[in-house]
Amino acid sequence: MAISKEKKNEIIAQYARHEGDTGSVEVQVAVLTWEINHLNDHIKQHKKDHATYRGLMKKIGHRRNLLAYLRRKDVNRYRELISSLGLRR
């Protein structure tokens, strides 16, 4: 199931850097994280759904690339983001 418009707007409002910000790295990573968590729950119930698993891996790779970019450009923003999303230990 895709992310609802209301949920996506809620995530955007929480992680946006300024009004109308929908494309910053923080927003993209936050939306991807929600989608990844949702797909993880689906995969736990439907272990043989290989197409969804492939989509999950693609989203994880995209998030990894965005986080690597953010870490190169601004370490402080990277650290704030991963702590707020609870991605690393």
Curated annotation (Swiss-Prot):
InterPro entries: Ribosomal_uS15 (IPR000589), Ribosomal_uS15_bac-type (IPR005290), uS15_NS1_RNA-bd_sf (IPR009068). Keywords: Ribonucleoprotein, Ribosomal protein, RNA-binding, rRNA-binding. GO terms for molecular function: rRNA binding; structural constituent of ribosome. The keyword Oxidoreductase does not apply. GO terms for biological process: translation. The keyword Acyltransferase does not apply. GO terms for cellular component: cytosolic small ribosomal subunit. PANTHER family: RIBOSOMAL PROTEIN S15, BACTERIAL AND ORGANELLAR, SMALL RIBOSOMAL SUBUNIT PROTEIN US15M. Part of the 30S ribosomal subunit. Forms a bridge to the 50S subunit in the 70S ribosome, contacting the 23S rRNA. One of the primary rRNA binding proteins, it binds directly to 16S rRNA where it helps nucleate assembly of the platform of the 30S subunit by binding and bridging several RNA helices of the 16S rRNA. Belongs to the universal ribosomal protein uS15 family. This is Small ribosomal subunit protein uS15.
